[in-house]
Amino acid sequence: MATWTEFATAAPAMSAAVAARLTAHKHHVLATLRKDGSPRVSGTEVVFTEDGLLRLDSMPNALKAVDLQRDPRFALHANPGHHTMDGGDAKLSGTAVELT
């Protein structure tokens, strides 16, 4: 799986469009896997760090954080904003790495 920086280098136009969707609104929808394997959806904030990472923010003991510590796979759906979907839609999936 590519890092955000690798994605941006390989597909600059697409990564710019996705980044625009993710920075247009503060809150997005994160899907994680519960202990029993069923999906959990949660609101989350997304930040692009200075060193080119896509960071998913969470309180340390939030269920989404616990899910990601156990199974780091996730899907993220950008907030579509206004009902006209100006700017398109963005969905991505990946593997989270805990930052301490």
Where are these regions (language model features)?
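A short, well-structured catalytic beta-strand-centered motif of the EAL phosphodiesterase domain
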Residues: 43-48
